[in-house]
């Protein structure tokens, strides 16, 4: 049985952006549905075949900038490549 990793990525901060790297061998069970506490801009930094999915929506390729809205359940779906994204939390409005 796989023990879920609550942080299945490496994270650094650069120029006010959160940089997250998900390994090509990440376990799919670690990529759980969740809702963020803040609205965020997510920008992929590498060519990849990963997907992004919001609740009650079909998955979309994670190949362009996304707006992830606070409180909306979502997940990423593992591809075969490494995934590197930069994330900016937006101020509450």
Go through each PLM region and give its residues:
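Short acidic-glycine-tyrosine-enriched beta hairpin
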Residues: 53-73
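Short, surface-exposed beta-strand-loop junctions and turns on beta-sheet-rich folds
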Residues: 50, 57-60, 82-83, 91
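Double-stranded beta-helix
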Residues: 3, 8, 16, 21, ...
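Domain-scale activation on soluble regions of proteins
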Residues: 2-9, 65-69
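Conserved short histidine dyad/triad with adjacent acidic residue
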Residues: 17-36, 67-71
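Ligand-binding loop in jelly-roll beta-barrel domains
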Residues: 69-93
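Short, conserved beta-strand element in jelly-roll/cupin
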Residues: 35-50
């Amino acid at each position: 049985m796989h023990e879920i990793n609550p942080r299945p990525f490496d994270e650094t901060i650069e120029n006010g952006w959160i940089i997250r790297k998900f390994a090509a061998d990440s376990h799919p069970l670690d990529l759980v549905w969740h809702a963020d506490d803040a609205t965020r801009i997510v920008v992929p930094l590498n060519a990849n075949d990963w997907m992004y999915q919001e609740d009650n929506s079909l998955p979309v390729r994670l190949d362009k900038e996304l707006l992830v809205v606070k409180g909306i359940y979502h997940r990423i779906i593992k591809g075969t490549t490494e995934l590197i994204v930069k994330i900016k939390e937006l101020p509450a409005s």
